[in-house]
Amino acid sequence: MLKIKLEKSAFENAKAECSLVFIVNKDFNHAWVKNKKLLETFRYEGEDSFLDQENKILYVGVKEDNVHLLRESACSAIRTLKKLAFKSVKVGVYTCHTHSKDNALLENLKALFLGLKLGMYEYDTFKSNKKESVLKEAIIALELHKPCEETCANSLEKSAKEALKYADVMTESLNITKNLVNTPPMIGTPIYMAEVAQKVAKEGNLEIHVYDEKFLEEKKMNAFLAVNKASLGVNPPRLIHLIYKPKKAKKKIALVGKGLTYDCGGLSLKPADYMVTMKADKGGGSAVIGLLNALSNLGVEAEVHGIIGATENMIGPAAYKPDDILISKEGKSIEVRNTDAEGRLVLADCLSYAQDLNPDVIVDFATLTGACVVGLGEFTSAIMGHNEELKNLFETSGLESGELLAKLPFNRHLKKLIESKIADVCNVSASRYGGAITAGLFLNEFIRDEFKDKWLHIDIAGPAYVEKEWDVNSFGASGAGVRACTAFVEELLKKA
């Protein structure tokens, strides 16, 4: 992990083996920009990057005056520098446009520091010829790129320290999530997922309970158990319950995650091409583990419960079948018409368990539907629920954190599509259209009336795992949901 060191000095006086200078919105008129004739000779116009080898300066373009692009450019810069022979880099403080003018400096520092740190991530656990970067340190010269109000300048050091704590915690939490999602299925079993959660709990002084199939049977979590039936003798299920209890808690929040450690579709078998990347079907549960790490280390004033349903969905003589009727923990019967709509079955019972805790807010995270990816693209998560104020708060705070989110609306016509003639509800829609919403409406069937306005469903199927670099995310897992929900909880508590 890249170490960030704060220095109360001018950019020119800070000592490092190389310099990083951002060109914001193609503006070269700044003292930190050297040898402009060289840049003109090579026709560098402030897009992408350019290495001035003589002066040991890496120029990286920030295409617009936007804090999210600053974060992305900082990440891109480190991806370039970590391939070179520099051990340290220095960079000044930039103030790009933010949504919130009150916290503009802090948000810029958070973006800069997080971008720098995330640029170092690469999942290379199984590579035999790892090339470890020599880049170890980023020196932050506490000098502003351009003048700002006196109050802004006076709060620079304080804001930098706060931003650095955020970046350290968020990087660690995202890496926990990403490493778990990226872990291949021969290792990343339900038991392994529980072990990762136990390690996080031990290091963060969190309370944790890990329950096996006997507990699930006692609690009549039959929908969850059905999904695991084909794997029971080899990789049994685990219900993981992490708890963070601060001395002062303004709210009780339950975070619920789908933890499908591998999903072949069950007897409704996926085509081979669609089976690849299904190690990432534990993205929701992994995000919840990362979130408990983030929220506890940031010291939020909320009691937070993280509930993860960890299981495989495989084939075998004991596998649950299309035509089965399952009785959920809530007592509702479910007609199974497709065993590849399994995540919602696990979540149904886990959401029931979460409601027993009587929380003020429930948020579930799941790589739930391919339909969500079709509708919103692979970079955007969907927000669903009944409470418009809660949905809006998650969307605005999540967007400000740098994640992409969009609301999808429930409606009575789509709800009719999951009706069953022989059970209380069907696990798949009668139509191919609106699949992300009908999946959310299925979960809604297991939310009690008193919790309808306290519940949000976040479908992270798109951004949880993408097989290319994008924004601050490397190939593979992105940690979708962690930044967004952390920001959501912080904003929620401000209103408490």
Swiss-Prot record:
Similarity-based family: Belongs to the peptidase M17 family.
Obligatory cofactor(s): Mn(2+)
Matches recorded under InterPro entries: Leucine_aapep/pepB, Macro_dom-like, Peptidase_M17_C, Peptidase_M17_leu_NH2_pept, Peptidase_M17_N
Name the record gives this protein: Probable cytosol aminopeptidase
Phylogenetic placement of the source organism: Bacteria, Pseudomonadati, Campylobacterota, Epsilonproteobacteria, Campylobacterales
Top-level taxon of the source organism: Bacteria
Cellular compartment(s): Cytoplasm
Residue stretches in coiled coil: none
Enzyme class: hydrolase
Organism: Helicobacter acinonychis (strain Sheeba)
